[in-house]
Amino acid sequence: MEYKNTLLMPKTEFPMRGNLPKREPAMQEKWAEMNIYEKVQEHTKGRPLFVLHDGPPYANGDIHMGHALNKVLKDFIVRYKSMTGFCAPYVPGWDTHGLPIEQALTNKGVKRKEMTVAEFRKLCAEYAYEQVERQREQFKRLGVRADWDNPYITLEPAYEAQQIKVFGDMAKKGYIYKGQKPVYWSPTSESALAEAEIEYQDKKSASIYVAFPVKDGKNVLEGDEKYIIWTTTPWTLPANLGISVHPELEYAIVKVNDEKYIIASELFETVAKTLEWENAEVVKTVKGSELEYTVAKHPFYDRDSLVMLGDHVTTDAGTGCVHTAPGHGEDDFIVGKKYGLEVLCPVDDKGVLTEEAPGFEGLFYDKANKPITEKLEEVGALLKLTFITHSYPHDWRTKKPIIFRATAQWFASIEAFRKELLEAVAETKWVPAWGETRLHNMVRDRGDWCISRQRAWGVPIPVFYAENGDPIITDETINHVADLFREHGSNVWFEREAKDLLPEGFTHQGSPNGEFRKETDIMDVWFDSGSSHQAVLEERDDLQRPADLYLEGSDQYRGWFNSSLSTAVAVTGKAPYKGVLSHGFVLDGEGRKMSKSIGNIVVPKKIMDQLGGDILRLWVSSVDYQSDVRISDDILKQVAEVYRKIRNTFRFLLGNLDDFKPSENTVAVAELREVDRYMLVKLNDLITKVKEAYETYDFAAVYHAIHNFCTIDLSSFYLDFAKDILYIEGANHEDRRAIQTVLYDVLVALTKLVTPILPHTADEVWPYIPGVTEESVQLTDMPEAVQLDGAEALKTKWDAFMTLRDDVLKALEVARNEKVIGKSLNASITLYPTAEMKAMLESINEDLKQLFIVSEYKLGGMMEEAPADAPKYEHTAVVVAQATGETCERCWVVSETIGKDAEHETLCERCATVVKENYVK
């Protein structure tokens, strides 16, 4: 007889190798055929809603690792919620207006100057839709379950119509106004920028100290002094109309040779050192407030420079006398307004100086620095010129420096509802908790929001102007424009004349001749995506406002979290979200930012093509995503190893359940052995721990708990000793069916627990599980932890056994290394435990030699009675020797019963019995 044919070895068609790059697309096709998204929505219909609102990625180019991290995190949450009593719809979105799309078309050779704005915008829309399609397929390849056929796209007519309504509501409440103000201006984009569209990079700038002679000392100064200002933007000096001093600071009149200079007293030493003054002495001090309304002369123009008081003046750097150009700085503008100065801005849209800067007209602002500095030197006003490298705002899209420039713009008045904004921040749940402080400070400190852009591709600002210049924004005009956009899209604004965009028969007292013109600026793209709570959450039947969660990268505190909050509070008085969760950025393996120049960019597509989507998803679950995270080939290799371990665990479980029918073979819990019940207690602990981790969005805890359970509880213990029963005993042996009962519970629970993270693998495992009826594991609920009778006592006892078992394993390892034994089944062990452990061992009814995977087990005396040379551990001394007898051909146990049965000379007594009872006819 071939005894190997009498072993019940694992049998399953579940493949050992994942081959995910090939298998996942097939699984995704299956999901598409069965309409998995709709099926899940149908299955969870009527449950409480959980809405995670998708912040729209920008529709341009392939998805990057930041996109992958973001979408996968969202998918974890949505999948988990739909398996725990919620209906969790997930509607993906795209942000589709803005400069990058205009630039992409220009780079493709589109000559926008040769076509109308409406024609150019049509090309922008086509390009945006192509990009949406491209990204949609890549997101689907990640295994993200979403309503991919019905996303929201910010350029769609229905969306734009709602955005117009949001603008109209804000205008009606008096929150929208037009004003001349310095705004961030990008000469390369030829447009105003919002704070969220700037980034700081190092820039080399001229650093100059300039003397402004006193013209009128107002009896405080003698008239022969000079104010010293410091600036790193010489090009703004043609726009200088004043000097600001702090009312509370003390100012010194410093005599240096034959000159007298005015600077803040506490900066005397610093300035003296910088300007290399020798023999400088302070001849007089005055308070800043006394210098108000004194007048200085502009260094190279025949005009006055008024001395004003400003709280923005600091002594961190410079001289305490601040060059003030109301057309080129927010503080300058505020102070200038208070003192009635004009807003002079001699720089055009392209960053070129105009005729209002005589002598420098036609020069690009940055190129004007040198001639202006030379002019200062020529007139004797330049006291010092050096160059410094400092952090300076840049256009986040063109990566070029920006300027402050006063222009006529449309603004949303944050000041008008700042208090409500701060209250809304306080009522929101923030994860991490520091998010609250971050957004609170941003809202507290931000100025009014410049919402107009001088570009073509975006949603038009729905404002008309009467003949007398009055802006027109009424309920009637807003509703009419919204209806037009809903029907024709926003391009209608650029295709029709103003009068054809107004309601029929519309009149206005400012237009006696019935003539009107329309605004040509468009809205900031942050106003687009920031209106999604109205256009998506409020409008779609399957969603609701406020959303339960917004989840984006930490750059969105100043972006989408902020703009959404502003429009929602302005319109509804409430935040659009109950909770906000943020994640960090993806860096390379060395913690460096990914960039083309370094060549360290990791692309999601490459990972999916080489390793598979589930490996990428498992990586997402393994990192502390609330901070910046790292990815590299080595890191992915480690993750792939963990995946292999999880997959092998599934395969082992399936293989050993091949002949198990849950309806017939399940053993009641009360009839299970203690060790089997202990495994169920461990499983229940796992279920509790994993669900708690999912609830708190701690996916790394899910990853570690599942990995440890597969490795430590199953592989190293339960599955290891269980082989001796599963393979060796007869099919229906009670111990074998007991273990299979536990393995079945473990398999079903484990498959469900990994589903949010490894959906492809979980759905691959599912149909192989005996007795399951659901079409997909996604149509099931998370397992419930069951409280077993006496669980605590059982856990205490068997945890103690496990610590003792660790001691035994160490002793066996030593014996192996010393060549006392080959493998552990060659061993005979005698234990000399502590009193406590002895009592515990004596209370175990299971076959201890099976649990220790040895051929002989004896309980000796107490620890102190152990032979002197026996290795002693914390809980026991262990004597390891060769087991006596011969090795059984079938079970590999060393036994003195080999050959007792003459018909089966090479088998031990146990195996001979099993063979006779089950295989001999």
Swiss-Prot record:
- Subcellular location(s) of the protein: Cytoplasm
Q: Enumerate the CDD domains for this protein.
A: Anticodon_Ia_Ile_BEm (cd07960), IleRS_core (cd00818)
The domain of life for this entry's organism is Bacteria
Where is motif 'HIGH' region found? 57-67
EC annotation? 6.1.1.5
State the free-text cofactor note.
Binds 1 zinc ion per subunit.
Q: What is its main location?
A: cytoplasm
Query: Where do the annotations place L-isoleucyl-5'-AMP binding?
Result: 552
Requisite cofactors: Zn(2+)
Q: Motif 'KMSKS' region residues?
A: 593-597
Q: Which SUPFAM superfamilies match?
A: Anticodon-binding domain of a subclass of class I aminoacyl-tRNA synthetases (SSF47323), Nucleotidylyl transferase (SSF52374), ValRS/IleRS/LeuRS editing domain (SSF50677)
What is one cellular component GO term in this UniProt entry?
A: cytosol
Which keywords annotate this record? Aminoacyl-tRNA synthetase, ATP-binding, Cytoplasm, Ligase, Metal-binding, Nucleotide-binding, Protein biosynthesis, Zinc
Annotated S-S bridges: none
Relate the protein's function as given in its record: Catalyzes the attachment of isoleucine to tRNA(Ile). As IleRS can inadvertently accommodate and process structurally similar amino acids such as valine, to avoid such errors it has two additional distinct tRNA(Ile)-dependent editing activities. One activity is designated as 'pretransfer' editing and involves the hydrolysis of activated Val-AMP. The other activity is designated 'posttransfer' editing and involves deacylation of mischarged Val-tRNA(Ile).
UniProt similarity note: Belongs to the class-I aminoacyl-tRNA synthetase family. IleS type 1 subfamily.
**Which protein are we looking at?**
Isoleucine--tRNA ligase 1
What is the originating organism of this protein?
Bacillus cereus (strain ZK / E33L)
